[in-house]
Amino acid sequence: MSFASEVKKELTQIAITDHEMKAELAALARMNGAISFGLGRGLTLDISTENASIARRIYSLLKRAYAVHLDLLVRKKMRLKKNNVYIVRVKQQADKILQDLGILGEGFTMIRSISDSILKDERRARAYLRGAFLAGGSLNNPATSSYHLEIFSLYEEHNAALRSLTNQFDLNAKAIERKKGHILYIKESEKISDFLKLVGATYSMLRFEDVRILKDMRNSVNRLVNCETANLNKTVGAALRQVENIKFLERTVGLDVLPDKLKEIAILRVTHQDVTLQELGEMVESGSISKSGINHRLRKIDQIADKIRNGESMTGAL
């Protein structure tokens, strides 16, 4: 089972009040519902989902809210994965239910935004977001993918209203248009965690946080290791260059041409190629020299070697 499926399963098990129930149903019916008319039978509402837990949730909420007869149908998809499609069918009072949920207006006109009557308080707003995620939400597994939560809406008006509602809770949701509809998405890990908590997926939120913290720790360690490796490579590269320059001077003009303080450091550097500058400074017989002092003397040796290579006089470098 995917992480998103586990989140949805948890959401379908949340106990809610009657007011929250209608808000959640409003999102499910608006986003997953289809309306049809038939001669002699009036309006029929079908709410479809490929998730059995969500189908049971829709069925039980409709029964509890409106006490109408419902049909539960199971169809097989003919394309791709050929999953089961569960359809909760409402034949009785479908028009009244849709009007009560703020989806159907006067004269059977569709209301594509979110009715204010559904979002009277924070608990109902949270319930609507829960229903929206159950209907069209997806969430990447934080352990194996980048952080990404999204909710699909068919209509731009609903997507805009959903984004506005989401951002009332400071979740920094963004919107984008796709070929078949509109997407609301959240990419910040902290905001995704806040969304899960907001809609009531507490256990999933804690799991998400565990993975996120561990992932962030690993990334921090990797950055630290990479930084230390880069510094080590830089140090090793500098040491190799210094030794090469000292050996070049020894072969060409001899180390005796160097001032005593530079000659001493040159001999120590060649003899102890794997030690740090600080350790090298502690080996000076006349008394310890700071890391910056050792570095200064080695740079002078590098300058002298460069002048010899270029056929220049050493005078300015001594």
From Swiss-Prot:
Biological processes per GO annotation: cell division; regulation of sporulation
Keyword set includes Translocase: no
DNA-binding region positions on the chain: 276-310
Keyword Cell division: yes
Any GO molecular function: DNA binding
Record-linked InterPro entries: Homing_endonucl, Sporu_reg_WhiA_N_dom, Sporulation_regulator_WhiA, Sporulation_regulator_WhiA_C, WhiA_LAGLIDADG_dom
Alphabetic keyword roster: Cell cycle, Cell division, DNA-binding
Residues of the signal peptide: none
Pfam families membership: HTH_WhiA, LAGLIDADG_WhiA, WhiA_N
NCBIfam families (UniProt xref): DNA_bind_WhiA
UniProt xrefs under HAMAP family: HTH_type_WhiA
Function description: Involved in cell division and chromosome segregation.
Protein family per UniProt: Belongs to the WhiA family.
Annotated protein name in UniProt: Probable cell division protein WhiA
Encoding gene per record: whiA
